[in-house]
Amino acid sequence: MHLPVVQRILGILLMLFSISMLPPVVVAEIYGDGSHLAFVYGFVVTLLVGLLIWLPVRREKRELRLRDGFVVVAAFWVVLGSFGAAPFLFSTEPSMTLTDAVFEAVSGLTTTGATVLSHLDTLPPSILYYRQQLQWLGGMGIIVLAVAVLPMLGVGGMQLYRAESPGPVRDTRLTPRITETARALWYIYLGLTIACAFAYWIAGMNIFDAICHSFSTIAVGGFSTHDASIGYFANPLVEMVAVLFMFLAAINFSLHFVVLRSKSLQHYLQDPECRAYTFNLFMLLLIVVGLLAYHKEYSSITDSFMKGLFQVVSIATTTGFTTTNFSAWPGLLPVMLIFSSFVGGCAGSTGGGMKVMRCLLLYKQGVREVHRLIHPNAEVPVKLGNLAVPQRVVDGVWGFFAVYIVLFMLMMLSLLMTGMDQVTAFSALAASLNNLGPGLGDVAGGYSGIPTAAKWICAAAMLLGRLEIFTLLVLVSRTFWRH
């Protein structure tokens, strides 16, 4: 392993990240909220630390290896969460402990959306903007966004991109060069953000709210500038805009690229994962609206449909916006919605969860095993569309699922040891590991009241979920460090 190479890249990335603390200074000056110094201090500290890390190894030019890439990704996300918390620590309003500041920053960067803050409507606009910006930067992954910049700095980007995007589709090529691939994803991400902000503004939001909510919508993050989330606006048009862009943001960005390049929407209909994703949302919607109408939770079927549609798309895509307190819904609905976050968005999207692709392959593998029981000698391939899936990919999906289950069990037991009840522990961990945000029980209204140890466990779960577990777990493997 080339530690000087890792150190050099870490320093560069930290210096680049410090720049993200300057836009909130502008917001603070525009609104005169008095919080500009918190971001100035955060910028200076982050920049200086990055500079001190980079200077001793600035002439190191060796190519980054795969193992180095994993270390950079894991280390940078931990460091990023720490330094992303700096403005919260330097701020006097709100006044936050180290634990709360790191929790909020990690939640933002991993696009989880769990928060320890309350009374959002009274907080300085610059703080609110910074939270939303953290989610937007984290949405596509700081590393993926930096892949387009690193080659200009003399650093190879391929290994970083592979480490940041694990899973069944990580080797998909949109363009021949990795730099062009990252840039294509960036343009799509930026284009969707601008379109979403404009749509929110047309629907009735002010400019500030439109920009802030477009950040967290396209990032599938769920942070809001108001305690009541999207429900604050009480505007059906705003809700429909949110539903549309949450739905789009949780679709594989590679698929968006193919559709834009070919100028044909047929690719959405032909893609097995996109079809499964849409079918999953449709079936959830039927069940939720049907049960809301059956229990007469709302005065009309229209209200049931609107509330049901919004919460199904928001929770199933792991965004976490709310227009109502879904944890108070009758019967199985709250738990079923939390379960839907385990599936999450499509692979290659900003959504969390295990991903539709993995769940689809697990289902197809289960069907194949049933066929094998009936016809023991038959060769039954697992197929996506007309293409057979390599056995190595299927094995990888099963490996991910097994590790996910074991990790979930261990972390839930750890949360129970902190004194949390079973419902709160289960939903808090599900919301953290799946990068969802809102939970049930004591965390239905926020995470400020849970024990300090539980906050650190949830923050670790957010990081594991954002990097899809293996990227962090590989670092504790004896094989990884053997040579």
Locate each region found by the language model.
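Membrane-proximal intracellular helices of multi-pass ion channels
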Residues: 1-483
